[in-house]
Amino acid sequence: MADTNETQPVGVARRDLMIAGAGAVLALGIGSAETAFAQAAATPALAQTVTPGKVAVERRGAVLLVGIDRPLAQNLLDPPILIGLGKAYYELEHDDTLRVAVLHGVGQNFSLGADLPALAVALASGAFPPKDGDFINSFGLRPPFRSKPVVVAVQGGVKYGGHELFLASDIRVAATDTTFSQGEVTRGVFPGGGATIRMTREAGWANAMRYMLTGDEWGAEEARRLGLVQEVVPSGNQLDRAVEIALKVAAAAPLGIRATLASSRQALAGEEVAFAALQAELLRLAQSEDRKEFVRALQERRQPVFQGR
């Protein structure tokens, strides 16, 4: 359930600022605090209007349900949510009674991206990223990696860092009302949470570029056509269907499941070089004049004029 103290809506300008460059902060906030702070610092620190998020965890036999629970803030990903996801994935990995997770978002949207102001504050204070070892990167950007599968159920908005979190799963179910976006290029940065690698691999080069280079949105049926979604179901049924699939996975031989994932990931080992190169490029764009121009334009309520520098 949502936090009852979370009663004030997020203003449009603040929401856009938080969403802008979400992938960059998500990728670096977990892997490199210094670089992530440079990205977050490019967005003005604004007063917080909503309470922190949380992750709701529920066990159903061998299935672990992991819910992003910040609906009144459109499930924007703040440090408590990112830490909660990392700890839930750690629990999945190290509890032998658990075989598969189902990731979902509470409320109207799966997630509209990252809460940049909250991340900037946490990075500056040293509260994020977590320093203990009971944590697995939910974006799969750095080790330790999980060896058990994640099924994701999405609805409403799946955008920016929320879309990259979605792409980091293994099996995907979407409601008919789902809208996807990976539009960081319209905000002076680029997708830094893995979309440039995963979306290109799964949807094909031109299909991925069609959306990542324009910032256009796409729907559930288009996502299925692109191969990013495996099933589209009536709105409201997505979580039940994801759990049904997860139960089938949980009934299979655990060693066989893990071996299948491990073998499949070995075929993608060359992508480690691309993942490793994300941080340097993110830092360069976070400090660019175009990124600063986007923030100024958002504050002045006008269209940005990018100069390519």
Where are each of the predicted segments found?
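Short, active-site-adjacent cap segments at secondary-structure transitions
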Residues: Q108-L112, K159-Y160, S264
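Conserved CoA-thioester-binding segment of acyl-CoA-metabolizing enzymes
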Residues: A2, D16, A20, Q39-V106
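An acidic, glycine-rich surface segment that forms the CoA-thioester-binding/catalytic face
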Residues: L82, G86, Y90, H94, ...
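N-terminal twin-arginine translocation
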Residues: G11-D16, V25-T43
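Terminal peptide-recognition signature
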Residues: V66, R70, L85, L103, ...
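C-terminal long alpha-helix characteristic of the crotonase
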Residues: T43, T49, P71, V173-T178, ...
